[in-house]
Amino acid sequence: MNKQAHNYIFEYHDAITSGRIRAGKWIKAIYKILVEGIKNGEWVFDQKKANKAIKFIENYCHHSEGRNDLLKLELWQKAIVSAIFGILDKNTGYRQFREVFLVVARKNGKTLFAAAIMAYMAYIDGEYGAKLYCLAPKLEQADLASVSYTHLTLPTNSLV
């Protein structure tokens, strides 16, 4: 599979339907909808836009605690980023999904992942005046994402 045609949504869908990666019924259902929507032309998939977001996160976003390594997205994260930034409304060309509700199990890096998506939207996505919200059951939890976002790109001088 060449790099241009690589689609993480399809790859993740194949992995969860084959049983190679375990996923719940709702995850399987949403990826089935995404794959069918892309295949039947309900939406346009722009691989270049999806890859741009993934590359930004992996090349400019650093861990905000502990080590200072760049983030390395897992397949499920690449599939989510691809869905957010690569699936477009066929009539308008705008992102199909403008609001995203992520439910991720404990200790899977959801705060850092959300902060990386926020950084891409703030610095690169090109939407003037974009509003980014962090919601959580407690203010302290939402503040973690805000603090992570603030520290995420600090080691990257090329953004300054």
Task: Enumerate the language-model features and the residues they cover.
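Phosphate/NTP-binding elements of NTP-utilizing enzymes
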Residues: 1-152
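Single conserved hydrophobic/aromatic residue that forms the stacking wall/gate
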Residues: 151-160
